[in-house]
Amino acid sequence: MERKYSHIIVIGVDGAGSWFKDADTPNFDRIFKNGAVTYNALSSKPTISAECWGSMLIGVGPEVHKLTNRRVSTLPYPLWSKHPSVFRRIRRAYPKAELGSYCDWNPITKGIVERLMGVSHATARDKELTPLICDYIRQKKPDFLFVHFDSTDGAGHKNGYGTKEHISAIGEVDTLIGYVHSAAQEAGILEDTLFMVIADHGGTNPGNGKGGSHGGWTDEEKYVTFAAVGKGVSSKGIGEMNIRDLAAIILYGMGIEAPSFDEKGWTSQIPKGLFTEYDGVYRDISHLTGAAERISREHHKSELL
C-alpha cells in the first residue's frame, strides 16, 4: 500500500464538540478553507475523554479497549494488547519513523500510547506546550505527531459547554493551532502533510452557574468537529463519520493496511468523501452499544511530567 503523506499532524481539542462553527477561528477557517470539514462526526459512548481518545488512537470502541480516565491515569497501555495504538502500528511499519505525542492531558501519552515505542513526548498546559510542539516540528519533522489541547474542556466544565466562555476558549486554541500549522510550514513539510483537527466530545450547559458535564448522548455531547487538509483531501464534503475513524485515516495516510472490519474489534473506517482517490464501503455501526454510560463533571486532573 502506497504511503500518501510523509507527515501527519493531528491536533485534538478536548471538549470542543461542534462549537468550532460558532467560535472566532480565523486560523481554522484559513487552514481548512480548501479542506474537508464536518461538525457532525459522532463521538464514542460514553462521551468521556479516555473512551474517546482511546477509540481514535486504537480504532476500536470503548467496549473493546475498556479504557477509562482512571485507568489511563494509573496504568500503561499494554504492549501485548491485540488492539495496538496507531503509534505501535506505525512503529512496526516504519522502525525509524519520528513519532511524537505532545499532550496537555498526560494520561493519553502514559495510558493510551504504548511505552518503549520511542515516542517523543512532552506535557504542559496548552499555551506552554505549544512552543515545545513548534520547536519539535521544526527540529524533528515528525512522521506522525499527536497533539492534545485541554483548556477548552476546562472552560466547559467551569462555565458550561457552548457558553461564551467556552466558545472563547476555542478561539484561544485556534491561535495555537495557527502556530502549529505555521511551524510545519517553516519546517518545509507542509506540502506533504496531512493536517487534522478533531474534538473528542462536547458537553452540557445546565444554565445554573455550576458548569457543564459530559458522558451522555445528547446532540451537544455526541457531535464533534473534524477537519482535514492535504493533497488528495476532498473539499466536497464528508459523509457519515465516527471519531474512531481517525485511526483508519492515519493508517491510510501512512500507507499501512488496516485490520479487517470486525464488530468485536477494529471498527475504524475511512469516511466517504474524505479522500478524492478513496471510495470504499462505509459500514453502519450505530447499533454498537459502547461502554457503560457514566457522567464526567470535573475537569481532568493530570500531573505535569
Question: What are these language model-derived features?
Answer:
Residues 1-305:
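Feature captures the catalytic ectodomains and active-site-proximal regions of enzymes
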